[in-house]
């Protein structure tokens, strides 16, 4: 997990270098769930990331923060459907809406996908907390610039479920016919499950909260065997996601330095 000392460190470091780097603001909702294997793919492309942890007395990213993208993570037993709503739900929906209006790429994962859905005019339906191992099928050959696998596995640890607005495009469906990955606008993406999930993340979520999904022990054993497959499937997914969110393009930190020079 990222170990920056303050919420400003990654942004300060990225802008202080001779060749400024892109920085992603990551909203974390539980101690157990983080970017997981996605971290390695970002670091390998010289993309920094900074976690914001309102659940641990931290603050949400400010409106002025020069983030090149916003990632909203899952929330364990927290949801957005009215049963056990995330305490900072309203603020995060508004923050997401602001980032979308300014053109910043947004990626919502699990609960984060619900927040993104609400920010773009969709809704959320109540549903019990579940841990599901699913098979997803691509619905568009050009999804994620053609890098989304035709079929892939998805692990969903989530309460409630997003109900997409009509203008959203479903990029993949799970084997139950539900949206697994979807897109709204040019650069906002929702994932029902965390593509970078690790076995230890799910184990930590189970230990972190008193509420545990039904059949969690059985699903954990299945997930243990699935780890190498998930790791391989993440490679093309991250390639496409980084391209579609322009995270290899000129970072905001670089543009701000150019503006200061001018």
Residue spans of the language-model regions?
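Catalytic nucleophile loop
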Residues: 99-123
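Short N-terminal binding/cap micro-motifs at the start of the first secondary-structure element
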Residues: 33-37
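Hydrophobic, well-structured mid-protein blocks that either form specific transmembrane helices
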Residues: 110, 119-152
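Cofactor-binding loop segments of dinucleotide-utilizing enzymes, especially the Rossmann-like FAD-
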Residues: 27-29, 54, 111, 193
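Flexible gly/pro-rich beta->alpha loop and the following alpha-helix that scaffold active-site loops
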Residues: 43-107
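Extreme N-terminal starter segment of soluble prokaryotic enzymes
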Residues: 20-25
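Amide-donor transfer/coupling interface in amidating biosynthetic enzymes
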Residues: 11-14, 26, 139-262
């Amino acid at each position: 997990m990222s170990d920056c000392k303050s919420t400003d460190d990654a942004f300060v470091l990225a802008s202080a270098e001779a060749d400024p780097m892109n920085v992603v603001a990551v909203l974390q909702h539980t101690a157990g769930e983080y970017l997981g294997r996605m971290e390695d793919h970002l670091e390998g492309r010289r993309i920094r990331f900074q976690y914001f942890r309102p659940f641990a007395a931290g603050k949400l990213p400010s409106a002025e923060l020069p983030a090149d993208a916003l990632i909203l993570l899952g929330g364990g037993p927290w949801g957005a459907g009215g049963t056990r709503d995330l305490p900072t739900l309203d603020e995060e929906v508004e923050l997401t809406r602001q980032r979308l209006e300014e053109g910043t790429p947004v990626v919502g994962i699990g609960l984060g996908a619900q927040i993104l859905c609400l920010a773009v005019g969709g809704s959320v339906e109540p549903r019990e907390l579940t841990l599901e191992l699913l098979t997803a099928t691509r619905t568009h050959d050009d999804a994620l610039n053609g890098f989304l696998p035709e079929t892939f596995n998805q692990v969903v640890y989530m309460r409630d479920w997003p109900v997409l607005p009509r203008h959203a495009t479903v990029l993949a469906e799970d084997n139950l016919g539900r949206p697994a990955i979807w897109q709204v606008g040019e650069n906002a993406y929702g994932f029902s499950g965390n593509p970078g999930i690790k076995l230890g993340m799910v184990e930590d979520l189970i230990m972190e909260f008193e509420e545990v999904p039904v059949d969690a022990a059985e699903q954990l054993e299945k997930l243990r065997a699935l780890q190498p497959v998930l790791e391989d499937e993440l490679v093309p997914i991250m390639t496409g996601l980084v391209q579609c969110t322009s995270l290899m393009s000129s970072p905001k930190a670089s543009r701000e330095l150019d503006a200061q020079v001018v």
